[in-house]
Structures are given as structure tokens and as C-alpha cells.
Amino acid sequence: MKNLFKRLPTFSADYSGVCNAIQHMCCLIILHGQGGCIGGVSTCDDFEKEKNEERILFTKISEIDTVTGNDRKILNQIVLDSQEIEHDFIVIAGSPIPMLIGTDWKAWVRELEEATGKPVIAMNTKGFLTYEEGEKAVFLELEKKFSKPVKKENRVNIIGDTCLSGWTEDRRTNLKSNLQRQYDKVISWNDNAGIEELQKMCSASINIVASVSALPTVRKLEEDYGVPYMIAEEELKEIKGMGVFNKTGSILLVGEQVIMNQYRKQFRKNGYTGRISVCNFFEMNLEWMEEGDCRLEGEDDYIKYLKEQDGYEYIVGDPLLEQFGGYQKEFINVPQIALSGRLLNDR
């Protein structure tokens, strides 16, 4: 029963991760399923789809087509849509319905590539995992589909800078501006990367890891093509309300590991000497964790963790976490889209 949430909403699913990870690329995104799963992406998890809304399509498979397994109707519609929408390649994300009826993704890829003449990637997402699993999977598929040996250039790839991982447009712009002082070309996979940029991914001097989701891909690129990687280091804006902090007080940062680790680094740089811990409801890399850090499985884990740590003077996290207490002085609101979605972020 540990996965029964009584006070928190369900977390962003793997297909939301796929859609968010590639929504700014020059690709046609197809989310295959019925209205319920689609609503989770379009109304809760997708904060930036307005920029490329015309390239995100939902099949909204009907009950009769589900029962009869009528894939042909949907495939024909995808082909027609691909003729009207500019794109370099197609990515299809699954949901619980395709899983239940046993959709043959390999056949879909084969038929759509033959009919459209464009590369096609099918993601066997089911909605049972959280968003970062979808991001990891689609990044690896992009590497598998488009990577090839090319001549090295003075360029850099930024991978994992998605809105579900806490990256805003301003944050991306600042990181790119800093990197442009050192490199001739800076390619953010979350900023209109087309097929030409992806096919040159192995020409990079270095890859920048913007979230934990990027780790498997950058490690594969290092292993296969010798492209090193480093963690994104961007000077983050001061957390609103941080001025109330006692510099010797204990602080808990709840959120995506790369960003929260950067906040921790900045706290220490600014003279904070108290205990600073990072925890997250989504994947964390053990190598980046310090004593007291924790990967949380759900709200019961969070309550247990706060008790084990005897609470903190200050907690920085999504507003929905304030109800659990665990802080002696102040709770600072830093919304996490993958946790609360539009519920609080639109306010």
C-alpha cells in the first residue's frame, strides 16, 4: 500500500516524459491512447506545448477500434497528418491501451517509415512508470537512431533540460549563453533540435547533463564515441524567501537532483554551514548523493524520512509538501511540475 497516495496527486507518467523531452525538436509527436491518458499530458504536465502545439497529435482511439484492433485507420491518419505538418522525424508514445491490446510497435515503425519516408521511433511507454523513465528511454532511442561517427567540432550538446525536470526557458537561455563563450555551437535537445543536429551529436566536444534523465545517453555516447560529459553548472536565481534563512540552520531541498545539488552548492558558496540535504520523488544518481540525501518512493516515504532526520529548520519544495510539516521555521515554495502539475503552477 506504500504507493497509495492520500494527499499528493499522481506523478507525471512516462509518456508525459517522452512528450516533454522532445516537444521542442523538429518532430511529429503522436500519443497513442484514449482521452484519459491524453488529458494528463495536455492539461497537467505540458507547460510549453503552445510553442509547438501543431506538432503534438493525439490518436484518441475509439472503443470499437480498440476492441477490433483497427490499427490501419490510425496509421492512415498519421500518414495524412505527416504530409501537412513540417517535421524531420516521427515519435510515437504508447499508453495503457496499446499495452493491453498488444500493439505491434515494430510493425508500426516499418509501415510508417515506408509510407512517410521519415525516420520513426516508437516508445513502448505504458503509463506505469514516472516521467524520468520516459525521458531516459527516448534520449537513448534518439542516440540509437541518429548517432554515427562524424568529425569532431567545437560544439556542445545539452541533454535533459526539460520543463518536467525543472528547466524554464530563462534557465535554458542562461546556460546556453554561458556555454556560447566557450563553444562555437551550443545545441540544446530541448530547443528546436532538428535531424541534422541529432546526426552530429557525436561531433560534440562535450555533453552537458541537465538532469538525471540524460545520464544513460551521455554515458553511451562516451562509451561508443568518446564524447565526455559534465553536469550542468548554471548560476541559479536566488530562491525567493531565502533571505530568512539562518546560515547555520538545516535545509532540505526537495526536487530534481541536478538543480537541487546546484542550489546546495550555491548555499555553501554563500556561507551556509548547516546541514543541507536533497531528496526527490524521482530518480537520483547515487554518485551525486551526500549523507542524508534520499530517493523517495511516495508520500509515506517522505513522512518517514522527515521523522528519521528529526525535521529541518527550512524546507524548499513543492507547495503540496507543506502539509506534511517537518520544518521548524519556514517552508519555501518551489513548485515541481512533475509532482503538482498545473494544480499550483498556474497560480
For each predicted feature, which ranges?
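An N-terminal assembly and electron-transfer interface module characteristic of large anaerobic redox
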Residues: M1-R347
